[in-house]
Design a protein with these regions (language model features):
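Intrinsically disordered, low-complexity terminal tails
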Residues: 1-66, 332-338
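Alpha-helical scaffold segments that mediate packing/assembly in large oligomeric complexes
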Residues: 145, 149-164, 168-225
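Short gly/pro-enriched beta-turn/loop segments at secondary-structure junctions
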Residues: 228, 233-237
């Protein structure tokens, strides 16, 4: 029982995951012992079975698959988090019930204005105003890959190749998600009012290369954009999202302007050259949503997977269900000449 309790942490440690408070036995275990324990927990040892045959039987059990998956999940999540750190700072999660297309409705956070009350005045009832949300239906995308651990790997207690694959898939999921975020920004979709998200009329376009003057005008536009209820949004610039070729300039510009404590640079590799976006804090005005399957407990799912019998291996499936969408046209200014 103690071996099984320590097994997932043992796998996680072996593949290089950072494990907080690992089981005391985690470091001393090897894969062969884990596989044999899984076999014996499922069915007692038969008289004719050798150590190797017990190990082989254990590799085919659901228990061994779940152990591999639990250990691999920790590394996949950590590599995903490291790679996704930038785009997750300026996006917000949005739960969807299933994989069917869904419309995202944006409620205007400033749509109902508080009113000054006189003495004994009646408090008026406000009605939430729907913002011009994305009229295009969006949906979750599923990215997945199977990874196996061979009998030789188990015998040799060697998880280097497995570790490299799992870590790579966690990072790959984050890169694919970032690409969807970039496409959501660049798509300039039609909103619910029939007009495109970005246009001069919406006070959210600065069609010039990034420099101090352009940044200043974009900051002013965030302040002066109008909510659907007609209020000045008064939004403070929080994130400067740029294409890779603009990153150094963006960081130098913020440093020279004394804005490094106010505005944070984030880079999206899939943006066209010269592109930049200035966004408000997503807590004040969410603009870009990253889709998640409702009820999912993790951004990356790692599940046991039965490998083809001829491969003589145990396996896991690394899966990411994600998507991205532009939620509203306020709280963002698009810059660049691309």
């Amino acid at each position: 029982a103690e071996i099984l309790a320590a097994a997932a942490d043992s796998v996680a440690v072996a593949i290089g995951a950072r494990v907080k408070n690992p089981h005391p036995l985690a470091v001393g275990l090897n894969l062969q012992t884990i596989a044999q324990t899984c076999a014996l927990a499922t069915q007692p040892r038969r008289e004719w079975e050798t150590e190797m045959s017990v190990m082989g039987r254990g590799m085919n059990t659901d228990l061994f698959g779940k152990t591999l998956a639990a250990g691999a999940r920790q590394l996949a999540l950590q590599t995903y988090d490291a790679q996704a750190a930038e785009h997750l700072t300026f996006t917000v999660p949005f739960d969807v019930k299933n994989f069917n297309p869904v419309e995202i409705v944006a409620a205007d956070a400033q749509g109902v204005a508080l009113e000054l009350l006189g003495e004994n005045a009646e408090v008026a009832t406000g009605v939430a105003i729907l913002d011009a949300g994305n009229a295009t239906e969006v949906r979750l995308h599923t990215f997945a890959k199977n990874v196996g651990v061979s009998r030789r790997d188990v015998v040799n207690d060697d998880l280097q190749l497995f570790s490299a694959f799992v870590a790579g898939l966690g990072g790959s999921a984050a890169r694919l998600e970032a690409e969807l975020v970039a496409k959501a920004l660049e798509g300039n979709p039609l909103m619910d009012d029939g007009a495109q998200a970005f246009a001069e009329a919406h006070n959210n376009v600065e069609a010039v290369a990034l420099d101090a003057e352009a940044l200043g005008r974009a900051m002013a536009k965030l302040r002066n954009q109008r909510t659907p209820s007609g209020q000045l949004a008064g939004l403070r610039a929080r994130f400067l999202v740029v294409a890779p070729d603009v990153e150094f300039l963006a960081r130098q510009l913020l440093k020279d302007s004394g804005l490094t404590d106010v505005v944070t640079v984030a880079v999206l590799a899939n943006l066209p050259e010269g592109r930049w976006y200035l966004l408000a804090d997503p807590l004040a005005c969410p603009v870009v949503a990253v889709l998640r399957l409702a009820g999912s407990t993790s951004r990356i799912l790692v599940e046991p997977h039965k490998m083809p019998i001829h491969t003589d291996s145990a396996g896991v499936r690394v899966r990411c269900d994600t998507g991205a969408a532009l939620v509203r046209r306020q709280g963002i200014v698009r810059g660049g000449t691309a």
